[in-house]
Amino acid sequence: MIDLSPLVRRLAGTPLASWSQGLQAQLDAKLEKGHGDLDRWRGALEALPALQPSEIDLVNGLRLDCDCDDATRAQMRQALMGLSPWRKGPFDLFGVHVDTEWRSDWKWSRVGPHLDLQGKRVLDVGCGNGYYQWRMLGAGADMVIGVDPNWLFFCQFQAVQQYLPELPAWHLPFALEDLPANLEGFDTVFSMGVFYHRRSPIEHLLALKDCLVKGGELVLETLVIEGDENQVLVPEDRYAQMRNVWYLPSVPALARWLRRAGFSDVRCVDVSVTSVEEQRSTDWMRYQSLSDFLDPNDHSKTVEGLPAPRRATLLARK
């Protein structure tokens, strides 16, 4: 069982205290339903060697280290491989380099400098395996809760957390819809790589706003296209082989949507074209990746002939 009592204690006296009281039962109910591969992934977690990190770096990346021998490293590598595919990272865990599909550290280096997370209560919606949660703590966040219903990501988070049990980061295998309305308890809310999967983009923005305290900040990172405030791409079918991509607005259109949803002080802090160096297949993620989804003769287009992935990060205030 995963014990959430430290989280409940952490949230005592905050606007999230009443919500926290029901989290253990909510988590236990989710775990009871489970997933067909959960036992296998738990086996991988149990196979991780018992180590105590003497070096912890969450500022320059995600690196844990201590004195350990080659046999222990081999055990670590085999156990972590049992949790493949690894999407977000990279992680350096006691001499084992988990070379993930995404160079998420590149994204963080673009986004992080624009944020003030010092002492903030943070929610990361669609947090994946929690890579960014650890980086948020490295940037001074007081605590970080991530929500993502993907069970493999949940187990990957547990793999890192078991070496950092005292740090105030929690991963809940919930969807945003599992959170109560009008939560209004987080200083900063992240939605990175989620927005374009939502069929109702304005509803998503309103739900994110509901999670923020008054004056809190939204960090929204999503796929965009070039164009003016009236330009929005709605793929006819797939986008970069993904069926679940609905809306790719231009940056000015997205800024307008944020204002329409009631946000203020909207500003774009980064726009980057995703390269095949930033997202690619590795030993830790052996499936198809970005290069397979782009036109082989013209990387400015997807295989469907649509504009290649371009990502923007916008900040907005409640």
From Swiss-Prot:
It catalyses: carboxy-S-adenosyl-L-methionine + 5-hydroxyuridine(34) in tRNA = 5-carboxymethoxyuridine(34) in tRNA + S-adenosyl-L-homocysteine + H(+). Keywords: Transferase, tRNA processing. SUPFAM superfamilies: S-adenosyl-L-methionine-dependent methyltransferases. Gene3D superfamilies: Vaccinia Virus protein VP39 (3.40.50.150). PANTHER family: METHYLTRANSFERASE (PTHR43464), TRNA U34 CARBOXYMETHYLTRANSFERASE (PTHR43464:SF95). Belongs to the class I-like SAM-binding methyltransferase superfamily. CmoB family. This is tRNA U34 carboxymethyltransferase.
